[in-house]
Every structure is written in structure tokens, then in C-alpha cells.
UniProtKB/Swiss-Prot annotation:
The UniProt record lists the keyword Flavoprotein: yes
Stored InterPro entries: Amino_oxidase (IPR002937), Carotenoid/retinoid_OxRdtase (IPR014105), FAD/NAD-bd_sf (IPR036188)
Pfam name, any one: Amino_oxidase
Reaction(s) catalysed by this chain's protein: all-trans-4,4'-diaponeurosporene + 2 AH2 + 2 O2 = 4,4'-diaponeurosporenal + 2 A + 3 H2O
Highest classification ranks of the organism: Bacteria, Bacillati, Bacillota, Bacilli, Bacillales
Record gene name: crtP
Record's keyword annotation contains Oxidoreductase: yes
Keyword set, alphabetical order: Carotenoid biosynthesis, FAD, Flavoprotein, Oxidoreductase, Virulence
Required cofactor(s): FAD
Species name: Staphylococcus aureus (strain MSSA476)
Coiled-coil regions, chain positions: none
Listed name of the protein: 4,4'-diaponeurosporene oxygenase
Family named by the database record: Belongs to the carotenoid/retinoid oxidoreductase family. CrtP subfamily.
GO biological process: carotenoid biosynthetic process
Function per UniProt: Involved in the biosynthesis of the yellow-orange carotenoid staphyloxanthin, which plays a role in the virulence via its protective function against oxidative stress. Catalyzes the oxidation of the terminal methyl side group of 4,4'-diaponeurosporene to form 4,4'-diaponeurosporen-4-al.
């Protein structure tokens, strides 16, 4: 008899797992509380402006292409992606700008401010991150390893310690090899992919730089939601039954097994396996009602990553100095991280990510206008949440900073504005305290690991998404779905012997 898989949540991790399970011959039902598939890969359109509500950067497209190849299909027949050789532009408070290109040589050619020594150091750092990326790919990505003990067993103690560089934090690894203060800050902010601090995260996450340099940075034509639409189409073609607007209220358990889910309609649906794309702690807390003692232990070890104050602005002018992807850096990177991740306050001088897809895709804003998305990282929801007044003051601080750093009269030109706070993120995606990136990567707290993909309490419950390994970011959550499918397939094959 064909076994039934229930997937809770239609984010990229959930839809990826559903596709692989269906490709492997299982009966798969996916339940998504929202009316779209993709989770945080969401879309907002108004007054002629189009915005990616969630992630705006696509990296490692081969992870997505594999899903189509398993079905003997080509991703290019479903969605169009475009490589961006000019990866992003960094603005600094003193007026310095640095353009990051795909390739160290190209970066040197486009930045007269960078010396020969700067480029040599950048190449040396790339070589260092390549070594980490290669060893990470072998075990962490290809085999879905989940813990430090699994890493050590797979690679050997000395090999793991040296090549994963567990001795240093990410920022220590950068500062050891890079002397240019602008490059130090720019490279440190690659940690944005996982919503953490480069001063706390382990050096293994330096591999994010090599990953982007080697695999490229891509734009999904028309908006990144088209990638989610492509995966939804593939899932339906493979026989996945997708229910949108369908909320799972709880997971039924018996001893150490999960038996099915209860929907908000009252209907009970049985399952042989459950894969939750809802974050781990909210799953245990709200769907299973795990006891307080065990929940508290998990919350101490796996603290939420950062959230964000997200502004979608329709602007009645153009700023020629902007690239597609832009970063407006803080005067004091350490203080910014300290305020967000330790003091848990809205930062005085935030680093701001600004994406302007209209620079590449002119369909995203009316002629002569621009669609600007602004994202500074801020703390997840605290026991005493920020107030409406706090957010209003922070909004002014953001606009003041952007105007001071070159976006002249930005306030005057805003003709459309939509804002998401951590509370909106929590409400729409049931994320843990409004975190965007799942679990924080912290060398001391969790050695940079997120939750394992297999439940430690229920033998047929699995997790995918940003709160589990291999981590946040759209390629990683998609890979987590494929890794969970591999684990279930291996388990079933073993049971049949």
C-alpha cells in the first residue's frame, strides 16, 4: 500500500520535499494556510509597482534545477532566470562606494579605490572560503549532516576542525585576511543570508562568499514568486495534492509517533510521515503542545534569527546611483550587530539592504519611477514588543540615513508605501517571534547549527525550512526539503530489507 506523506506548509522547503516524495512514489498532501505557495517568497503589487515581499536574491540555481531533472524536465521551460555579474553596490557613510562583481579580477577593474594589496587579500580570502565551501558541500550539503558529531565522524576530527575552521568567528576569519575596513564590513554582511552576526557566527559561514562568487547571483524575471509558481506547477504535475487556505491546527501523536493532522475545519487526515515546513519551535509549541521544560531547553539553544523592518516604496523619481542590489552600511558594524543581537533594541544606525529590481526589469515600476524595497535587520519580537511609536521613529531614522547617503528628497518622492514589521511576518508565516531566517547562527550557542531535520521526540516527524540545517536562504531551505526526502527514502529502503 502506498504510504501517505503530509507536508505542513508550502514554503520552498515544503514544496521541495513534496516534489521529491511524489517523485519517489509516495502519496503526498500539502496543506498551506495562505492562498499562495512559496511561503516568504511572496508578492505584492499596487499602483503599477511590484515587490518581492520575501527574498530578492537567487543563488545556487542548480539546487532548483535538480528538482526538475528528477522528473526529466528543464527548469528553463518553467521560469526564466538572469545572471547579474554586477552583484551589488556598497555605500559607506563617508561617501565611499564599492561595487562587488562576480570574479575578483572584475571587482578590481571596477573599483579604482581598491589597491593591489586589497585585491590580493580578497583573492586570498576567496581561496580560504573555497576550501570551506568544498568540505561543506561533501558532508553538510550532499549527505545532510545535522550535528557536529556527525561532521566529525564523516570527515575525521582533525580534518573537520581545520577545514571547517571552528576556532574562529566569521568576522575573525575576515579580519585575519582582509585589512581594508570597507571590505571587512562588506564581507561580514554576507551573514545577512542567515540573519545573524558575523561577530557571533562561526567562520564556516564564510563559505557564503565563495558560494555567491562561484555560483553567481541571479534574478528571476518578473519577480522571484515565479520560481515558487514553477515549483508548484511541477508538484502538481508529479501528483502532489495541494490545499491552499488550509490551516493545520494540531498534529496528533501516539507515544513516539505522529499519526496525522487536524485541520481548522475539524477534519482529521492520517499520515505515515509528517514533514513540517513550519518552524520547529512553533510546530512543537502550537501544533503538538510540547511540555514547557523541553520547549525552554530548545529555545535557549536555538534562538530566533533576526527579523526586519521591511519598507516597499513606490518612488516618483529615479536614482541613477542605485544598482539592482545595494547596501547602505553603518558607521559602526560591531555596535549595529550588538544592538540587534544582544541588546535587542532597534539599532541607532542600521545597515540597510535596498533592492531596486526596476534597474534590471523595467516592468516592476511605471516609466520614470522606481520600486524600492528597504530592509534593515532588527530583533525578533521581544517579551515587551516594540510599539507603533518605536517603529515610526525607526522609519524616520531609515529615511534620514538614506537621504543623507545620497537618496535626495526620498520622502518627498514616495507615492506608495507598504510596511511589514516582525508582527506581520509572524502572523502571515507563523515564524518563531517574527524571525525571517529561522534560527540564529551562533558559535557559542549552537556552533552555527540549526535544528536537525529529524524530530528528536517523534520518529516519523521531519522538519524543513529556515529553522533546520542546512539553514536559511532560498537555496538552503529548498535543499533541506530534498535532504528530508532522501532520509525518508533511505529509511524505507532499510525497512524493506
Amino acid at each position: 500500500m502506498t504510504k501517505h506523506i503530509i507536508v505542513i506548509g508550502g514554503g520552498l522547503g515544503g514544496i521541495s520535499a513534496a516534489i521529491r516524495m511524489a517523485q519517489s512514489g509516495y502519496s503526498v498532501s500539502l496543506y498551506e494556510q495562505n492562498n499562495h505557495i512559496g511561503g516568504k517568497v511572496n508578492r505584492h503589487e499596487s499602483d503599477g509597482f511590484g515587490f518581492d515581499l520575501g527574498p530578492s536574491i537567487l543563488t545556487m540555481p542548480y539546487i532548483f534545477e535538480k528538482l526538475f531533472e528528477y522528473s526529466k524536465k528543464q527548469m528553463s521551460d518553467y521560469v526564466t532566470i538572469k545572471r547579474l555579474p554586477h552583484q551589488w553596490r556598497s555605500f559607506f557613510p563617508d561617501g565611499t562606494t564599492i561595487d562587488l562583481y562576480e570574479g575578483i579580477k572584475e571587482t578590481g577593474q571596477h573599483n579604482a579605490i581598491l589597491s593591489k594589496q586589497d585585491i590580493e587579500e580578497l583573492q586570498n580570502y576567496l581561496n580560504y572560503t573555497r576550501r570551506i565551501d568544498r568540505i561543506t558541500e561533501k558532508g553538510y550539503f550532499n549527505y545532510g549532516l545535522d550535528t557536529l558529531s556527525q561532521i566529525i565522524k564523516f570527515h575525521g576530527p582533525l580534518n573537520a576542525l581545520i577545514n571547517y575552521d571552528y576556532v574562529h568567528t566569521m568576522q575573525q576569519a575576515i579580519d585575519k585576511r582582509i585589512s581594508n575596513p570597507y571590505l571587512r564590513q562588506m564581507l561580514g554582511y554576507f551573514i545577512k543570508y542567515v540573519g545573524s552576526s558575523s561577530y557571533d557566527a562561526p567562520a564556516v559561514l564564510s563559505m557564503l562568499f565563495h558560494m555567491q562568487q562561484e555560483q553567481g547571483l541571479w534574478y528571476v524575471e518578473g519577480g522571484i514568486h515565479h520560481l515558487a509558481n514553477a515549483l508548484e506547477k511541477l508538484a502538481r504535475e508529479e501528483g502532489v495534492t495541494i490545499h491552499t487556505g488550509a490551516r493545520v491546527d494540531n498534529i496528533k501523536t501516539y507515544q513516539r509517533r505522529v499519526t496525522g493532522v487536524r485541520l481548522d475545519t475539524g477534519e482529521f487526515v492520517k499520515a505515515d510521515y509528517i514533514i513540517s515546513n513550519m518552524e520547529v519551535i512553533p510546530t512543537y509549541k502550537y501544533l503538538i503542545h510540547l511540555d514547557t521544560q523541553r520547549l525552554n531547553k530548545l529555545e535557549r539553544e536555538f534562538e530566533p534569527a533576526s527579523s526586519g523592518y521591511v519598507m516597499h516604496l513606490g518612488v516618483a523619481c529615479q536614482y541613477p546611483q542605485l544598482a539592482h542590489h545595494n547596501f547602505f552600511f553603518t558607521e559602526n558594524a560591531y555596535l549595529n550587530y550588538q544592538q540587534v543581537f544582544h541588546e535587542k533594541v532597534l539599532p541607532d544606525d542600521p545597515t540597510i539592504y535596498l533592492v531596486n529590481t526596476n534597474k534590471t526589469d523595467h516592468t516592476q515600476a511605471p516609466v520614470g519611477y522606481e520600486n524600492i524595497k528597504v530592509l534593515p535587520h532588527i530583533p525578533y519580537i521581544q517579551d515587551q514588543p516594540f510599539t507603533t511609536e518605536d517603529y515610526a521613529k525607526f522609519r524616520d531614522k531609515i529615511l534620514d540615513k538614506l537621504e543623507k547617503m545620497g537618496l535626495t528628497d526620498l520622502r518627498k518622492h514616495i507615492i506608495y508605501e507598504d510596511v511589514w514589521t516582525p508582527e506581520d511576518i509572524e502572523k502571515n508565516y507563523r515564524s518563531n517571534r517574527g524571525a525571517i531566517y529561522g534560527v540564529v547562527a551562533d558559535k557559542k550557542k549552537n556552533k552555527g547549527f540549526k535544528f536537525p531535520k529529524e524530530s528528536q521526540y517523534f520518529e516519523n516527524l521531519y522538519f524543513v525550512g529556515g529553522s533546520v540545517n542546512p539553514g536559511g536562504g532560498i537555496p538552503m531551505v529548498t535543499l533541506s526539503g530534498q535532504q528530508v526526502a532522501d532520509k525518508i527514502n533511505a529509511r524505507e529502503a532499510k525497512n524493506r530489507k
